[in-house]
């Protein structure tokens, strides 16, 4: 445990807690599609995403709930195994995978409990809106960016 990336599971749990608490606060405080402008380019808008990224497949008959739930569950297993096999010395990679695990878990919890993902971070410019997203999505994105950076900086033995 201490000699692998699993020592970063605390980061996964902290980010997962932040994701779930923020989603709970939005659901408790907002009606569906209610929006509060925070900055000229940013609003908190409560949205239920039945699909994947950018609401992909959201208009299907309901099968996508179980499809995306299964994909998220498999991703969580892969990330946990990956952390377990990552040496302690690969800190940046471990952090990246821990963040992506937290995002996958956060959205998996939403899909399993509600059948949709709770999104609320809404960026917009000149009347154009970027698709709403959440803390879990942000962790997946940040983890992916860190993984790309790690691939450029790591010493690889080929």
Residue ranges: model-predicted function:
Residues 1-158:
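Alpha-helical transmembrane bundles and membrane-interface segments of multipass inner-membrane proteins
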């Amino acid at each position: 445990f201490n000699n692998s990336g699993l020592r970063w599971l605390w980061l996964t749990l902290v980010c997962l807690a932040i994701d779930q608490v923020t989603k709970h606060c939005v659901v408790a405080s907002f009606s569906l599609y209610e929006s509060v402008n925070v900055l000229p380019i940013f609003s908190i808008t409560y949205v239920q995403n039945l699909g994947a990224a950018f609401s992909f497949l959201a208009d299907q008959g309901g099968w996508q709930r179980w499809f995306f739930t299964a994909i998220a569950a498999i991703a969580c297993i892969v990330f946990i195994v990956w952390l377990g096999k990552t040496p302690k010395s690969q800190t940046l990679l471990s952090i990246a995978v821990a963040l992506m695990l937290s995002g996958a878990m956060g959205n998996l919890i939403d899909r399993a409990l509600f059948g949709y993902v709770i999104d609320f971070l809404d960026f917009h410019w000149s009347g154009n809106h970027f698709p709403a997203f959440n803390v879990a999505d942000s962790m997946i994105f940040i983890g992916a960016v860190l993984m790309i950076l790690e691939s450029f900086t790591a010493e690889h033995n080929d």
